[in-house]
Design a protein with these regions (language model features):
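N-terminal amphipathic/basic-hydrophobic helices that include classical n-h-c signal peptides
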Residues: 1-14
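Extended, well-ordered protein cores
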Residues: 16-280, 289-513, 517, 521-577
């Protein structure tokens, strides 16, 4: 016979434990002072606090235990939390953690090695099977390796009322805007992910395979054996590398002609396969004369533009003085010829092309909008800026905010309303789950996505250098997302706007699902609309200046962008959401 009392006690025991994560940098430092305070409150209540290490160094050690002594080995806490996250009793406090770029990953490896941990070097260009295996393990650690594992649910985020009221009484600084501002967003008009996207709703459960079929008839399986669920939305898209480089070259010239700073805004951390390549493209194009002139030497030094100018500077430091000086002189000549670069640190000469993880779009664009639409130049002064965001999918959001501020001036934290967010995040939805399905092709041909019966679900033509990307969005998270939006709209009596573009293949399929699943709920008296991201931005801004609130109901990327953009403008930071 079941002892329901004992079962109940076991459940309560499990639910009275909180997992507190150990991460990196500032959050790790804060933990030393904050965690004892948390424990002082939870212990009398019978709530246990358990720490788990998901820091970059911790994840490296956990994945390379075969290189360590028994005393150095640690548990794979991220894998443990990934299993725990699907359990109903899970209570996990996930602090911000590093989404490491290659330079950050390499620095962490060197630091561990210096402390006596014999972890292997990161082989950027593996030459053996063992090096290929090591690189693959490290590639799972770099970028946003934590969030896709832990984010099993959708997102419902807003600034607490107390934080909003504090910002109104103690407003943060907002730079003045000029109607004559030359700041603007530049995106591709052809050859980007947006323009090439195809989308399919899977009619029945199956397994899929991604295959490259070369123009010469050769084939290469890029991924196979992965599952698809009934009703799942899958997409494929291609970024043309040749058109991307043409775009960069044109925008560099345009920034020079307009006398504005040149900047690029990507997410090389979360989009750890595609965006470092996009970043490397602009680094190469800006310093093209240098990379072309020293191509053989740079190849010998393993200098990859994807790692930024900082990697170049570091690797030429050991060259003979005359050779190093010649390269530095050529770099200086490029600076003088090309438009001035937006800076990460003007005093130290660190540009926004130095490190791929230094300028991250969801933080960098709101910061610039808050600062009169300007960034800092090499002279340490603010200046109007060209914001290069290659893909069109979401760049219109930022251009709309810029246009609005040019016309109406800076937003006022004292009077402005709020834009909260309900985000489609669960089970690695959309682009943020695409890492293992993103490939840079080495030749011309087509990339096919086929089901287990051999039917072609999607097909994309590619050229050498192009980036192919496939995304998945499961149906259950979409249904939950719609329910969350309806519940939030009713609880707050606030308009809920689905930010979906009917002219984009993926969004067109999602619009059909949203319209279908809204019928499962009582929406009487609610204001629920579907708008393109640019139109939804304009609508939200028109309300925000009147002190009115709006709910943005978005996909995974815009969840990330909006939960930085609006909080930074409203309360000065996204850390208080």
């Amino acid at each position: 016979m079941f002892n329901f009392v004992d079962i109940g006690r076991q459940i309560l025991s499990k639910m009275s434990k909180i997992i507190y994560t150990i991460t990196d940098e500032a959050p790790a430092l804060a933990t030393y002072s904050f965690l004892p305070i948390v424990e002082a409150f939870t212990k009398p209540a019978g709530v246990e606090i358990e720490t788990r290490d998901i820091s970059l160094s911790g994840r490296i050690l956990a994945n390379f235990s075969e290189f360590l002594t028994d005393e150095q080995k640690i548990s794979d806490d991220l894998a443990y939390l990934g299993k725990l996250a699907v359990e109903p009793e899970a209570n996990i406090i996930k602090l911000p953690n590093i989404s490491a770029s290659i330079p950050q990953l390499v620095a962490a490896i060197k630091e561990l090695q210096a402390k006596g941990y014999a972890v292997p070097d990161y082989p950027e260009e593996p030459k053996t099977g063992e090096e290929t295996f090591i690189k693959a393990k490290y590639d799972k650690i770099k970028g946003s390796a934590v969030n896709p594992v832990l984010r099993e649910g959708n997102s419902d985020r807003r600034a607490p009322k107390a934080v909003k009221e504090y910002a109104r009484k103690h407003p943060h600084s907002m730079g003045a805007w000029s109607a004559d501002s030359k700041s603007h967003v530049s995106s591709m008009t052809d050859g980007d992910f947006y323009g090439s996207e195809k989308s399919v709703v899977v009619p029945k459960a199956t397994k899929y395979k991604i295959t490259f079929v070369g123009a010469d008839g050769s084939t290469k399986v890029l991924k196979e054996g992965a599952s698809l669920l009934e009703g799942e939305t899958i997409d494929s898209a291609v970024m043309s590398y040749s058109k991307l480089n043409d775009f960069y070259a044109k925008e560099i010239e345009d920034a020079k002609a307009k006398d504005v700073l040149f900047s690029v805004h990507l997410k090389a951390t979360m989009m750890k396969v595609s965006d470092p390549i996009l970043f490397g493209g602009v680094v190469y194009q800006y310093f093209k004369e240098v990379y072309d002139k020293y191509a053989t030497l740079f190849d010998e030094l393993n200098i990859n533009p994807n790692n930024g100018l900082g990697d170049l500077e570091k690797k030429i430091a050991s060259l003979p003085e005359d050779q190093k000086a010649a390269i530095e002189a050529d770099i200086k000549a490029v600076y003088e010829k090309n438009p001035a670069l937006a800076m990460v640190n003007s005093d130290k000469g660190i540009t926004n092309l130095h490190v791929p993880s230094d300028v991250i779009i969801d933080a960098s664009m709101p910061a610039a909008i808050r600062t009169s639409g300007q960034m800092w130049g090499p002279d340490g002064k603010q200046k109007d800026t060209k914001f290069v965001i290659p893909d069109r999918c979401y760049s219109g959001v930022y251009q709309t905010v810029i246009d609005f501020c040019k016309k109406n001036g800076a937003l006022d934290p004292v009077t402005m309303g709020s834009v909260s967010n309900v985000g489609l995040m669960a089970q690695a939805a959309e682009e943020y789950g695409s890492h293992d399905k993103t490939f840079q092709l080495t030749g011309a041909g087509t990339v096919q996505v086929t089901d287990e019966e051999g039917n072609v679900l999607m097909e994309q033509a590619v050229e050498a250098g192009d980036i192919f990307r496939m995304c998945q969005t499961k149906d259950a998270p979409v249904q939950d997302w719609v329910k969350l939006a309806v519940n939030r709209a009713r609880a707050t009596n606030t308009p809920a706007i689905f930010w979906l573009d009917k002219n984009r293949a993926h969004d067109a399929n999602l619009i059909q699902k949203v319209e279908k699943y809204l019928k499962d709920h009582d929406t009487t008296g609610l204001d629920i609309q579907i708008m393109s991201p640019a139109d939804a931005t304009q609508y939200s801004l028109e309300r925000i200046v009147k002190g009115l609130d709006t709910i943005s109901v978005t996909g995974n990327v815009l969840r990330d962008y909006n939960t930085d953009l609006f909080p930074i403008l409203e309360v000065g930071t996204s850390a208080k959401m």
